[in-house]
């Protein structure tokens, strides 16, 4: 039974898997994008988002926790000074996975894990204006369609006239 066994093993020993993900997180935060297999990308996403959350906290303990996992001090500095401030208003979901297809050599599904660049706007609790009746909305649409219809017929009427002149 697989009780309390979350995560993917990826056909590696525990030490190999941890070392691989430490390297991948370091590269991902350094380049802000990484191409890998789907399974690795899905596992890496959770680790990377935890690192960005540590960067958002910004205290000394969070810095030391991130430095214990990320292998390069310059990348830790980049995380806390450049990457984390971009996501101060975002409550999670800092990365996206884009599937690329299959890799030609071994037919493995490949995807790109990248940071989300679009700034999130907080939802406003403003009241929405009252909706107009459906009949009122349908009338302007019908009027717009009626205006477009004669425009579409005009070129059709000119085309037969052009054919008659060529025959004569």
Swiss-Prot record:
This is Large ribosomal subunit protein bL17. Residues 123-144, 149-168 are annotated as: Disordered. PANTHER family: LARGE RIBOSOMAL SUBUNIT PROTEIN BL17M (PTHR14413:SF16), RIBOSOMAL PROTEIN L17 (PTHR14413). Pfam families: Ribosomal_L17. Residues 127-144 have a biased composition (Low complexity). It comes from the Bacteria. Coiled coil: none annotated.
